[in-house]
């Protein structure tokens, strides 16, 4: 049985990890959300989240966006390539309902799977 946990090893934790992705990213995006990705040598994907207070004013909305993004990643982690991902929320993301946000994330994960070089 496949484990769908979200342990610490699957998260980008330090500014160095984020900087690594920002240097040479592969981009996939919609008007409300962008996912940056860069291949890593770890053999598994990792995720980092940036939801700026400038774009999403209320804390409960920022938390909802982060929660749904983590859940989407957790469920697809075994299908994703070994890349470090940074999810960047943009203006207007708070207007998306849960279903629309989940569908947008699924579309972007599929796009990253297609863009990733075959290993």
From Swiss-Prot:
Listed HAMAP family: RNase_P
Enzymatic reactions: Endonucleolytic cleavage of RNA, removing 5'-extranucleotides from tRNA precursor
GO cellular component, one term: ribonuclease P complex
Top-level taxon: Bacteria
A GO MF label: tRNA binding
Enzyme Commission number(s) from the entry: 3.1.26.5
Protein name per the record: Ribonuclease P protein component
Any GO BP annotation: tRNA 5'-leader removal
Family the entry assigns: Belongs to the RnpA family.
EC category: hydrolase
Subunit structure, interactors included: Consists of a catalytic RNA component (M1 or rnpB) and a protein subunit.
Function: RNaseP catalyzes the removal of the 5'-leader sequence from pre-tRNA to produce the mature 5'-terminus. It can also cleave other RNA substrates such as 4.5S RNA. The protein component plays an auxiliary but essential role in vivo by binding to the 5'-leader sequence and broadening the substrate specificity of the ribozyme.
Pfam families on file: Ribonuclease_P (PF00825)
Keywords assigned by UniProt, alphabetized: Endonuclease, Hydrolase, Nuclease, RNA-binding, tRNA processing
InterPro entries: Ribosomal_Su5_D2-typ_SF, Ribsml_uS5_D2-typ_fold_subgr, RNase_P, RNase_P_CS
């Amino acid at each position: 049985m496949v484990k769908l946990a979200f342990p610490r090893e699957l998260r980008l934790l330090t500014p160095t990890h984020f900087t690594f992705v920002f240097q040479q990213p592969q981009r996939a995006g919609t008007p409300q959300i962008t996912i940056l990705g860069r291949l890593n040598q770890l053999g598994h994907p990792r995720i980092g989240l940036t939801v700026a207070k400038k774009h999403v004013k209320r804390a409960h909305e920022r938390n909802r966006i982060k929660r749904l993004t983590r859940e989407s990643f957790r469920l697809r982690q075994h299908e994703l390539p070994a890349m470090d991902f940074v999810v960047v929320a943009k203006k207007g993301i708070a207007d998306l309902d849960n279903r629309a946000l989940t569908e947008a994330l699924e579309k972007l994960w599929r796009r990253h799977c297609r863009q990733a070089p075959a290993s």
